[in-house]
Amino acid sequence: YAEGQRRYVESLSAYARQFLERMDKPDVDEIIGISPAIAIRQKNSTKNPRSTVATQTEIYDYLRLLFARAGTTICHVCSREVKKDSPESAADEVLTRLTEGTRFFVLFPIQDDVSRAIVKTAKKAKTRTSVKELSTSAFLISLLQQGFSRLFRSGEMIELQKPEDYLFDDFDNTFVLIDRLASAADIRQRLVDSLEICFREGHAAIIETTDGKQLKFSDRFICKYDGTRYEEPEPHLFSFNSPFGACPTCQGFGNTIGIDYGLVIPNPLISLKAGAIEPFTRPTNAWAQKELVKYAASANIDMNVPFADLPDYQQNCVIYGDEGWRGLKGFFAWLETKKYKLHVRVFRAKYRGYTKCPDCDGQRLRQAARDVKIGKCSLPEIVEMSIADAFTFFETLEMDIERAQIADKLLLEIRRRLKFLVEVGLDYLTLGRLAATLSGGEAQRIQLATNLGSLLVGTLYVLDEPSIGLHPRDNSRLIKILENLRDIGNTVLVVEHDEETIRSADHIVDIGVHAGEFGGELVFAGDFKALLASENSLTAKYLRGDAEIKIPNKRRPVTKQIIEIVGAREHNLNDISVTIPLDMLVCVTGVSGSGKSTLVHDVLYAGLKKKRGEWNSPVGFFKEIKGGDLVDDVILVDQSPIGRTPRSNPVTYIKAYDAIREVFAGTNTAKTKSYNASHFSFNVPGGRCEICQGSGTVTIEMQFLADVELTCEDCRGMRFKQEILDVKYKGKNIHEVLNMTIREAILFFKDVAKLISRLKVLEAVGLGYLRLGQSATTLSGGEAQRVKLASHLAQKTANNTLFIFDEPTTGLHFDDINKLLTAFRALIDNGGSLLVIEHNMDVIKTADWVIDLGPEGGVGGGEIVATGTPEQVANVEGSFTGKYLKQMFAT
């Protein structure tokens, strides 16, 4: 990818290159036949708070065009259609709506500003009546001079020979009469001519029948019935990134900073009496709770019912106030008057957060944009739909012939992109989902769908584990997408460990045999059939069944040591209750979007942390977590980097480097020169090279060329001063030791028990190939997660600790998964409990207990489909996980 991208970028001008990602020339002799390359990574790099699924996939751009060109503006006052008329369209509507022979008058209104100007002039004058008469007279004379000699008021025609013929003081409900006609097909041209005069002189036309019925028309974009002005739909009106379209209150973000009632009432599943309103539980605010009790009695509000179960109007009364009760809003408004006190400002800050914008209700667009509809839905309403619902909406959308012709190509693009998103298994996401909240796998599949939608050909696509986050049920759809990319004329290169994807590949390149120092060789290249016959390939051994991840002979039994979540109702969780056994490996499974992360992260992890006073963010809704006191600690082991600087490395993370520094500080040379352990650290001044500050390299910015990272000239990349490098242990200096692999270091330091015990856990989790001083920035997400796992294993005891892992098999080969499961068993043997969110069937089949959520994603999920041992789940009808377990147990 680096070479394909580099060659393409080099073909651009120097000016253009400075805005593009800059690639180093890879260390390779020659690459022949390479195409321009696109890399679709497995991480979510989006930080923009405005970016959504719809904007990233370009669906939003097509929706903006669709609403601007084919949308119907509906007046938010009278709910009638707002449109701009022409004389021809108005004439056609009149002749269509009036039966033949119906007599009618063609009128235009005397503009309001004329009437207002006359009154305004009269008010300023000393003799108001005479001036008003003069102004009215002047206006009537101007009408006569233009040839308009008839007025119409209250169903009566007024012949105007001279100004004195008009007997009224104002022009309210007074119209200029242009023509009198009877509805018939042959009057169309005369009617068009009359309407042209109306639009030219008054920008509006009134058709009034002899029985008093009216038809109103205007050549301006206003509501003819209540006069409300509207913006003519243009694409930028529907952009929340444009000041023209964004809600002026929240500036297009959809939320504003204020009192977050989700923090004020953190758990609405408890009653007002039990302390649902968190600030009222403070002793200093006991008076406010008493006021609430008094108000509740007078308003007949049940204090013993969970707040969430109270009727909506009662909830609103509690929050926003009622007669005799200021409400929570009033309580915080009162606190605002006391903000000169520091403790009050600190107290209020605890309850401030981002809340839904009160003006646009979180829809991000101004009222004029929200008034435009297609198929009875506004653009924000469509964006709030799930991708599956949006796809159904546009597939069944019916429009009139004229609008259908305008929207034809736009609808084709929208439907095509929605179809691709459904096919990559993202149908449960909403179009308005913030891109920054997507998982790495979801972000990657959105990029994949976007690229497929662009229909590029002759391109090299490089994908890094696109199956991440996908349930086996959705894998076949993903493979179909990749095959479609190939079939339209692209090369698709996939880094993947998923067996089904490997079996579907046209050509397989196997690198190995093992990792690190023992890898980097081409083991095999060819098709799947030839791979199975390969003797040297570790991948082939697992595919053939020569090596396997074994199902345990017996599962750990469920004991009385359990955590029970009662009434979880966050996001799509449907008031579920679930039991999580401790002292074993528990897998939470289900299709993408079924609620796994919500249950484990937002409810269980956040709930247990909140109970310990270690959590300040919002917690998912639940009634109760029973058994939380059975665990002393809960630890989330994720795939975030273990460090963000080149000086961070695996041995510093697991505290093994302290022992290495002590070994060097204990040598005779170090003692003679009075060097202590800190002299062998590259994180603090003393022994490190101060030119590169212990990183071994210096970076030079090159503007439109790629930044150049040069080896430090002073220490020659060795990180330390020369006098520190002169200190040796068993003939090796600190730089040479840091360049050893973990396997080599175990043999080298075999006499240092304190160090060996920590290094061995890194080898136990399959990281023996890493170098001691390898920069944390070069580690993959899976490697970083296993380093964290090793640090917990190194502590020897994990008594009463609950470890939570989210897809720990990401980036792992079959052999690596085997090692990971061995480490999991060691953690449990040390007294820990493991809760793992996982799609990999090899891990799920080895679990002691499985909790399967679903049955579908999004609104179709959030239910407990099955719980039990893998064998029990395999026999549950309707469980997709059970279906694949059953297939696995049958082989």
Residue map of PLM features:
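Conserved phosphate-binding elements of NTP-dependent enzyme cores
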Residues: 1-891
